[in-house]
Structures are given as structure tokens and as C-alpha cells.
Amino acid sequence: YRLLALPGTVDQDAGEVLPGQSGIDWSVLWDDGSQEGFLTEYDGSGTFNFQPGRGFWAVSKEGVNVASTFATVSLQADTATTIPLHEGWNIISNPFGKPVPWAAVDAANGEQLQPPFGFEGTFAQRDTLASAETGRAFYFLNDQGLEELVIPYPGAPRQADAPEPALAE
């Protein structure tokens, strides 16, 4: 298994991305963040659509090669985008075409975040969110009650009126 994501503004079912048939040629799992029974198997629902910032556990008999072009995500105040979160562990991705230093993400979200983990055979903390153009996604623990994660565009100045992270009620 690997953590898999797609870049940009995408809304595409995992079953349309991976070659072959679910359960035979590939498997996709979503982590709902709960303490037990947290991995949900692909069921064709919208939960399993690749969307900006969303990733999955995936395994495939064949390599995954997506030859589509995706529109870039929109920026808030020309500086950042946001991706939705749930409480607990989330599989996230960087929807931009450039890597984003985790220190910039942490600063944009109040500087209380734990670093994300990548998985390439073993889990390891990452100090940079590689672009989802690489197909990579990351595990992130939302233990701060965030409804969304602000991801600043690399090199964009932080503006005084840029949105603050939203806290769950």
C-alpha cells in the first residue's frame, strides 16, 4: 500500500483512476479519523473521489499513471488554499504544483501542528509537503480541532486579511 493523491482542482472517483476492477486489481482505503474501525474500503461513494487535499491508501497490481491535466486550486487572498479536515488522523495532500515547507503550513495555522508523516514502506515525519503531482499523500493528526488546513502558496506573502484557520465547534 501507498498513500496516493492527485493535484489541483480534481473531483474524480478512485475507480476511474486505477486500472482494472476494485477488489481484484486494486484496493483503496479511506481513513475516517476514528479510534477504531477507521479504514473504510472503496464503495464507489463520493467519499472515494480524489479532491484537492484528499488522499487514500491504495494498492494496485499495475502502476498508476494519470495523464490528465487538472486546473489549479483557487487561492484565498492570493496567498493560500484550504483543505477540509476531520478530527483525528487525515490523509492529506498538497494540491499545488510546488512543494510547501511544513513550517509555512504550521505558521498559517497557528503554529500548534504536529508534522505530517509520509509512508514509503515505513512512516517518517516530513518537513515538506511534496506536490500531489508526485502522487504522494501524507498522514496528518488533526488534534487541534481544525475544520480545514490552510496551505500557503509557496513564495506568496501572508496578508494581514488572510483567513485564520477555522476551529470545529
Where are these regions (language model features)?
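N-terminal exported-region signature
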Residues: 1-167
